[in-house]
Amino acid sequence: MATDDASFPWDQDSILSRDLLSALSSQLCYENLNRSCIRSPYSPGPRLILHAVFGFSAVLAVCGNLLVMTSILHFRQLHSPANFLVASLACADLLVGLTVMPFSMVRSVEGCWYFGDIYCKFHSSFDVSFCYSSIFHLCFISVDRYIAVSDPLIYLTRFTASVSGKCITFSWFLSIIYSFSLLYTGASEAGLEDLVSALTCVGGCQLAVNQSWVFINFLLFLVPTLVMMTVYSKVFLIAKQQAQNIEKIGKQTARASESYKDRVAKRERKAAKTLGITVAAFLLSWLPYFIDSIIDAFLGFITPTYVYEILVWIAYYNSAMNPLIYAFFYPWFRKAIKLIVTGKILRENSSATNLFPE
């Protein structure tokens, strides 16, 4: 029997409207809030892959840098001013893996921020703090390597534990004060009030930085970078000269003091090479992001979201790279990892273990 549409308590328009509202609500971060951000979710397959890739990087950053810190702090043979700088750098990378990457993973993959406005600012502040802390640490490490390679016999009297402590304090204090004051005073958003108002919604966590502060941020990255590049160019020139001198001396009978100096210089050159690779990896990871931030600020935020996310995660992955570099180039680190993983560091006097091959 045919039925008339008017006999139903709803019509087709109301059905379509309700279906449309249902579809829209499923694309909102918070379905029952009018000011909710709109989600742009991935399909299940890519979402699973992205969670796995980003999650693995966070776990690697935490576990790898924890191994670096444990190795340096536990084994007395590694207690040196230079290694304390490396341990502090590992701490910055560890904190990126703990306080930044997991939350950024959810925001990047799910398209929403579910952790509240308060932690949004903390998260952004941590992100900026640990980035600049790493830059300052690497800058001081490059200066340390220059002194060690240029004059290894006097190095220990110049770069003491006290000097290392001051470098570590400066790196952390300046980066934390700068990032938190910049974001919590609202200075970074001055002149962008209309943009911030348009972007503000429940479930969003976007950092808006005006042109002036983007330029200052870039300078804070560029100046230490130029210092590192200048210092390491000198380090490799000195290393090349020392290698040539050792080759000449090897053809003659060397005094015991000369032989000792050569051994020390060789060890310092290897350390400088490894840390030079660490610096290069950092620059390759972060430079694209900083260049894009300059382009965005002065050309009207033209970077597509997916490109921005790629650049951010390339930078984040740097926090997981340093332990891999150490493991590849440092036999002592591989030996320390083995002792830690097997639980042998719990044995009595394990801190006195010899990690360096004869």
UniProtKB/Swiss-Prot annotation:
Q: What is its main location?
A: membrane
Cross-referenced InterPro entries, in alphabetical order? GPCR_Rhodpsn, GPCR_Rhodpsn_7TM, TAAR, TAAR_fam
Q: Which cysteines are joined by disulfide bonds?
A: 37-201, 120-205
Which PROSITE patterns does the protein's record reference? G_PROTEIN_RECEP_F1_1, G_PROTEIN_RECEP_F1_2
Q: Which GO terms describe its biological process?
A: G protein-coupled receptor signaling pathway
User: What does the record give under GO molecular function?
Assistant: trace-amine receptor activity
Q: Which SUPFAM superfamilies match?
A: Family A G protein-coupled receptor-like (SSF81321)
Q: Which residues are glycosylated?
A: 34, 210
Residue numbers on the Extracellular membrane side: 1-47, 105-121, 188-212, 296-309
Q: Which Pfam families match?
A: 7tm_1 (PF00001)
Transmembrane region(s): 48-68, 84-104, 122-143, 167-187, 213-233, 275-295, 310-333
Where, subcellularly, is it found? Cell membrane
State the protein's name.
Trace amine-associated receptor 7e
Q: What is the lineage of its organism?
A: Eukaryota, Metazoa, Chordata, Craniata, Vertebrata
Q: Which gene encodes it?
A: Taar7e
